[in-house]
Amino acid sequence: MKIVDAFIFYNELDLLRYRLTVLNKHVDYFVLVEATLTHAGNPKPLFYEDNKKLFAEFEHKIVHVIVDDFPKTKDAWVRERFQRNCISRGLSQLDVKTEDLIVVSDLDEIPNPKSLDILRKEGLTDICALKQDMYYYDLETLVQDDWLHPKVVSYDFFLNTLKSQIGECRLILPQKIMRKAGWHLGYFGYSAELIQNKLKQFAHQEHSKISKDDIEVRLGGRVDLFDRDMTFTHIPLAENKNLPPRHELLLAMCVSSVSLPAPSCTTPSCESVHEDAGLSSNKSQSPPPPSSPVVA
């Protein structure tokens, strides 16, 4: 059985290195999808393409998909979904079997390698959610709400249920949920300027007008960028029992994201068996989230 880690990419070179490093021994391939336009419709450099030499040790595992054929639209969500569904273009370049597994997540949604190992051992015929701890800004600011958007699907489920619209799996709340299955690192290590840049370019254009000064206030106070009803908890690193693997790389990470335009940078089974990172059943299944995904 093979595992393919598939995600869309914007410009976060250091976070990309972290993801590739911690998952390299646990997946067979990476499908990295980057585009010539932002979700807001603005031209952007191909940051991975321009910096491939920084990732030479992983290149033999990476299928790089460049999206330059967006449909003509003013809708940022149409562009977002189109780019994510282009994961299928990467899968078509691999010898993927029906029993193989596809991880579908954003770059900052880091799967737990132990969870992937369990799935590889036990298999999956349809879909499961990776229940992740959600951090904002740093590794000491934990959001009380769990994050359920990252999914793992079998290639058979992708072909016959999703009908190749792989991005739609993020909107499904499946019966199977794998606990302690990763870490969502929202705006991790970002300065106010970098956050403002991302907000101007991503699909949630309703948040694109937030000022840099307002962002700095929210960063300093460790409060939500979008005034949502979210509870932030400070948890010292020494007291955290579920830190990401090799978290020292995250602490030392200098985010390489830059304002656009810019030159190239130089620099799993039943709950009782797997208590820490196993599959459990979502007994009270809720309806899927609305068509616009939750802001990350």
Which residues fall in each region the model found?
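Active-site-proximal specificity loops/subdomain of glycosyltransferases
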Residues: 44-98
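Low-acidity, Ser/Thr- and Arg-rich intrinsically disordered low-complexity segments
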Residues: 269-272, 280-286, 291-292
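Short beta-strand-to-loop acidic/aromatic patch adjacent to the donor-nucleotide binding site
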Residues: 99-110
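Short, acidic, metal-binding catalytic loop of nucleotide-sugar glycosyltransferases
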Residues: 22-29, 33-37
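C-terminal catalytic/acceptor-binding lobe
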Residues: 172-270, 276, 296
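N-proximal low-complexity "stem/linker" segments adjacent to membrane-targeting elements
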Residues: 1-14, 18
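Conserved catalytic core of nucleotide-sugar-dependent glycosyltransferases
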Residues: 114-201
